[in-house]
Every structure is written in structure tokens, then in C-alpha cells.
Swiss-Prot record:
Record key words, sorted: Ribonucleoprotein, Ribosomal protein
InterPro entries: Ribosomal_Su5_D2-typ_SF, Ribosomal_uS9, Ribosomal_uS9_archaeal, Ribosomal_uS9_CS, Ribsml_uS5_D2-typ_fold_subgr
Native source species: Saccharolobus solfataricus (strain ATCC 35092 / DSM 1617 / JCM 11322 / P2)
A Pfam family the protein falls into: Ribosomal_S9
A GO biological process held by the record: maturation of SSU-rRNA from tricistronic rRNA transcript (SSU-rRNA, 5.8S rRNA, LSU-rRNA)
Xref: SUPFAM superfamilies: Ribosomal protein S5 domain 2-like
Lineage, highest ranks first: Archaea, Thermoproteota, Thermoprotei, Sulfolobales, Sulfolobaceae
MF term (GO), any: structural constituent of ribosome
Family, per entry: Belongs to the universal ribosomal protein uS9 family.
Signal peptide boundaries: none
Cellular component terms (Gene Ontology): cytosolic small ribosomal subunit
Protein name: Small ribosomal subunit protein uS9
Length: 137
């Protein structure tokens, strides 16, 4: 009979992007959509997703494995959603109030989220706010 492994599942949203993070005991590996984080080509996206682990410290990072599944939205929206899901899962996995305070002091949106959405396009307009120029003569 095998030992039961501790698994924490957390999800987050940013704009139209969604992310789900699974954290379990491991060796410090992080996978985003079944690809190791080291192989993600855009460095800014890679660093944004790794922020919660860098703030948590090497002692926590080396003891866990994380699997993040993202879908919807664009690249940066998915990165923000993955970052938020990872931070929430780390706080839940460790049960540390100190880690939560570190995240809130660094960036509140790491745990709380960002409710801003793109304004939809209106009828007879080019975009959400732009209207045809009015001519008086």
C-alpha cells in the first residue's frame, strides 16, 4: 500500500485567461502545460510565473513540484493567472501566514487578483469609445 501524497489544487483568472495549479511534494520542478518552465521561450513570462517561488525562498522551492495548466486569453494574461494560482497554492500548501504577508507586501494582485476587463465594442463604433468625427460644415 502506498503513502498518500499531499496535493493542493488552486485556480486563478486574469482577463479571459484561466490557470489551475497542482502542488505536491517533489524536487523543485515546475511544468506549465506539461512543458518545463525552463523551456518557455519568453523570459518575461518565465520570470513572472516564477515570482512566487523566488519570493518563497529556496527551502520551499526545492521541496515541491508544481504543474500549471493554462487556457484562454493571451500569453501575458495566462502568465498572470499562472502566477496567481501558484502563489495561492503555495500559501495553502505551506499554511504560512508569513508567506501570505510577503506576497501581499510585494504585490497584492498575487493573491487577490485584478478585476479589470476589456471594455466591449459598441454598436456603430470602431472600438469601445471611438466615434465618427462630427462635421459641422
Amino acid at each position: 500500500m502506498s503513502e498518500e501524497q499531499k496535493l493542493v489544487i488552486s485556480s486563478a483568472r486574469r482577463k479571459t485567461a484561466r490557470a489551475t495549479c497542482y502542488i505536491y511534494a517533489g524536487k523543485g520542478r515546475v511544468f506549465v502545460n506539461n512543458v518545463p518552465i525552463e523551456l518557455i521561450p519568453i523570459e518575461m513570462v518565465r520570470l513572472k510565473i516564477m515570482e512566487p517561488l523566488l519570493l518563497a525562498g529556496n527551502d520551499i522551492r526545492s521541496k515541491i513540484d508544481a504543474k500549471i495548466i493554462t487556457y484562454g486569453g493571451g500569453i501575458m494574461g495566462q502568465a498572470d493567472a499562472a502566477r496567481m494560482a501558484l502563489a495561492r497554492a503555495l500559501v495553502k500548501f505551506t499554511g504560512s501566514k508569513e508567506l501570505e504577508k510577503i506576497y501581499r507586501a510585494y504585490d497584492r494582485t498575487m493573491l487577490a487578483g485584478d478585476p479589470r476587463q476589456t471594455e466591449s465594442e459598441k454598436w456603430m463604433r470602431y472600438s469601445a469609445r471611438r466615434w465618427r468625427q462630427k462635421s459641422y460644415r
